[in-house]
Amino acid sequence: NLVKFEHHGFPLDLAALNAELIVRCHNDSNKNFQLLGEIYKKQNNWAVGSDINIINESIKNIGFDSGLSKKNMENCLKDEELQEQILNERIEAQKRYKIDSTPTIYINEKKYDEKNEYEKFKKAIEKLL
């Protein structure tokens, strides 16, 4: 309980928006993070091509494997209020945190720029514990 991870969706296209919608279908934050991990891990499999229907099916398969029902995911994908919320959060984050690329990592409200070097990231976290 020493580190708090927060995920803030920052979709750059429709596929990423739909992936974020599926992630938010889970009400359980632990399952939410597990699903998020699977979506990132399998991103090279689903975030390809130009047919959004095929992309959505790939994302839904990942969601289904994490315990979400197809009906629940379909409802989430159609939830216009949730879509608007996610897009507004993205705009707000872009303004507040000056995000210019993804992923962007903040540690204790300070932007961390060495995100591609795991050992440096690990040391930065351990130094604060």
Label for each model-derived stretch:
Residues 1-64:
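Structural alpha/beta surface segment adjacent to cysteine/selenocysteine redox centers
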Residues 61-129:
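C-terminal cap of thioredoxin/glutaredoxin-like
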